From Swiss-Prot:
The gene is rlmI. The keyword Methyltransferase applies. Residues 2-81 form the PUA domain. It comes from Alteromonas mediterranea (strain DSM 17117 / CIP 110805 / LMG 28347 / Deep ecotype). GO terms for cellular component: cytoplasm. One of its GO terms (molecular function) is RNA binding. Specifically methylates the cytosine at position 1962 (m5C1962) of 23S rRNA. The keyword Oxidoreductase does not apply. It catalyses: cytidine(1962) in 23S rRNA + S-adenosyl-L-methionine = 5-methylcytidine(1962) in 23S rRNA + S-adenosyl-L-homocysteine + H(+). Its EC number is 2.1.1.191. This is Ribosomal RNA large subunit methyltransferase I. It is an enzyme of class 2 (transferase).
Length: 397
């Protein structure tokens, strides 16, 4: 029999709305014994059953809910159903002849809290951020290979958030013989994904729709791609007819791969430049030189790690956007992003607006961009919305 988590009075409302988290402060009592990752049943203070989830004694999120169906066991069949349902949705989203890389499981939004699975052609990269995911690793791999027998599976559970669950970093082969790198297609663009050491699980799949937007706006433009990483925004801009693209990144290996991406997609390397420099420093130098571009892309790393750092992060976003706005020709476009889940969309918009004021310029928002469609947001879990983007016309008016 599973251990039981009893909630404090009046702390059942979020679970009744099917929010997948139970916080430590909501727990009144643990009846029975539960080790890290064990399945527990959750009850309100009057004894009504609310759901079933994974117990994490070291985390402020004490239980991550697997199911709200009383007759649903957390077994092989459970994980198979979750993966099968998620895969069916992804197959509706993409033309496999043009795109063969996507997020298969988006953790809470696909009913598997703390579990991420990204598919890169025939390689599935698994990231387990929760005690429950760790506990059921073998079941998850079994379900992957049941649905895709020819797939190779690699684990990239190497992020700091695992420490909050009392877990150590884990990487390595889980099934088959995955290569170190795999070349995939995204909207017809060839992209090399570094499975073992690339950012996240190897690539920023969540920016697919934003990259397509960049292609749409790039015709005949001189484009500045800041925090360019491996240059996929640049490849999309070139595919959309950009006159030139300048990539700025602090990582020379990333810029080398960006140059390779230009080559394997058949673009003219004479239309590209590569600047190995801190983006803040580069933008300040462009401002001092009065150098401007038709389109500037700002896709910085996450600035907000916790709520306490939000104000500091807002100042960072304001500074980078002010210099980014300086770098846009009058009538040109700024594509700016925040991938910080703790940065509210309205605050991000205010930060960009304040940056424009400080730059002495006017912005007009012409489009909003979000995480790609394979990163869905389930209605009961608004925290799943994390990537915000704005397309702004910049003028001197």
């Amino acid at each position: 029999m599973s251990a039981q988590v009893i909630l404090q009075p009046s702390r059942d409302k979020s679970l009744r709305r099917k929010h997948p988290w139970v916080f430590e402060s909501a727990v009144a009592e643990l009846k029975g014994r539960a080790r890290i990752g064990d399945t527990v049943d959750v009850f309100d203070d009057e004894g009504d059953w609310l759901g079933r989830g994974a117990y994490s004694p070291h985390s402020k999120i004490r239980v991550r809910m697997w199911t709200f169906k009383k007759d649903e066991s957390i077994d092989n069949g459970f994980f198979l159903r979750r993966l099968e349902t998620a895969l069916a949705l992804r197959k509706r989203l993409f033309d496999p002849n043009k795109t063969n890389a996507f997020r298969w499981i988006a953790s809470e939004s696909d009913g598997l809290p703390g579990v991420t699975i990204d598919l890169y052609d025939n390689v599935a990269v698994v990231q387990l951020l929760s005690a429950g995911g760790e506990k059921h690793r073998d079941k998850i791999v079994w379900a992957i290979t049941k649905l895709m027998p020819d797939v190779h599976v690699y684990e990239r559970s190497d992020v700091d958030v695992r420490k909050k669950e009392g877990l150590e970093p884990v990487t390595g082969v889980l099934h088959g013989q995955p290569p170190t790198q795999v070349t995939v297609k995204e909207n017809g663009i060839n992209i090399v994904v570094d499975i073992e050491s690339g950012h996240k699980t190897g690539f920023y799949l969540d920016q697919r729709d934003s990259r397509a937007a960049a292609a749409h706006y790039a015709k005949d433009a001189d484009v500045l791609n800041c925090f360019s990483y491996t240059g996929t925004f640049s490849c999309y801009a070139l595919s959309g007819g950009a006159k030139s693209v300048t990539n700025v990144d602090v990582s020379q290996p990333a810029l080398d791969l960006a140059k390779h991406h230009v080559a394997i997609n058949g673009f003219d390397d004479k239309r590209t430049q590569y600047l190995n420099k801190d983006v803040f420093k580069a933008l300040r130098e462009y401002h001092e030189q009065n150098k401007q571009f038709d389109m500037v892309i700002l896709d910085p790393p996450k600035f907000v790690d916790n709520k306490a750092s939000l104000n500091r992060a807002a100042r960072g976003y304001k500074d980078i956007n002010m210099y980014g706005i300086h770098a846009v020709k009058s009538g040109g476009l700024l594509l700016t992003f925040s991938c910080s889940g703790l940065m509210p969309a309205d605050l991000f918009q205010k930060v960009v607006a304040d940056a424009a004021l400080d730059a002495g310029r006017t912005i007009k928002i012409i489009a909003r961009l979000n995480q790609a469609s394979d990163h869905p947001i389930i209605g009961s879990y608004p925290e799943g919305y994390y990537l915000k983007g704005l397309v702004c016309e910049v003028t001197d008016d």
